[in-house]
Amino acid sequence: MTLSDVAELTCLSWDTAKTITKTHLAKDYGKPALRGVRYLGIDEIYLGKKTRFYTIVLDLEDGRILWAKPGRGKAALQGFWRRLRVAKAKIKAVATDMSAAYWSAVLEHLPDAVLVFDKFHILKLMNERLDDLRREMVREAVGPLKLEIKGTRFLLLRNPKSLKGDQIPKLDEALRLNEPLLLGWYLKEELRELWNQTSRKQMEAFLNDWCDKAGQTGIGQMLKMAKTLRTHASGILAYADHPITTGKLEGINNKIKTLTKCSYGFHDENFFILKLLSLHHSKYKLLG
């Protein structure tokens, strides 16, 4: 329900309905409780060319948005660290991507917390490396093979379990015709198993073995991926002790997109942030 709907139902002006709603949101959600929070997820969301990026901090246990600020990186988190100190929150672990903009801020302000590099961001990066390899193969290929490889992006990056019908033989044929893509695809699929290991020791052995295999291929994009994983190994292996991810933020991201489509007057930045902070108690449905 939009503010216009609320105003019509209550026979109030749009401005009055907004003022009442904003006052209520500020009272109930303006300062999220931080005492007792143990696990954080930090990520950025993209809201279009005009609004650009927002940095979001999520309580990974109860799904609350604890902080939302325009921008990305260290600067967007400054006020949050102050609030954490005041609340004397004892953060055990933080899940974030491998961007130095976020993890360096975590190390600086939460030196006792464990930094966990997010599984889904790592797999996304692997997909990007594989897609870069596919583009290289397209540039090098000639004749029918060029078209064969060019049309495989969706098939290569998709989870093979979700492929249907003639998609499977199409993928098989493309991989059969191009050994570098075949090796890259197998490495992509094998990497998923890293987070299924049952101990830190097994996880470390798996990661080292994977990086060795990637190195043995001699493929530039796979060498680049292996180097990234080795460089960030400590935060990747921390998952064994603190199995957290920013996966919940993906669901939140979808809610935020729906929220923005409902046109709640978000030229008012403070109002938008309050709506985000209350999102865990809200349900939005687009009406056509």
PLM regions and their residue ranges:
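A generic local structural motif
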Residues: 26-27, 78-83
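The DNA-recognition helices of helix-turn-helix-type DNA-binding domains
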Residues: 13, 24-28, 98, 133, ...
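Conserved phosphate-handling catalytic cores of large alpha/beta enzymes
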Residues: 130-147
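Short, positively charged, Gly/Tyr-enriched micro-motifs
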Residues: 1-51, 88-91, 236
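Acidic/histidine-rich catalytic cores and adjacent linkers
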Residues: 49-51, 59, 63, 69-70, ...
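Conserved beta-strand scaffold positions in the cores of enzyme catalytic domains, especially
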Residues: 39, 115-116
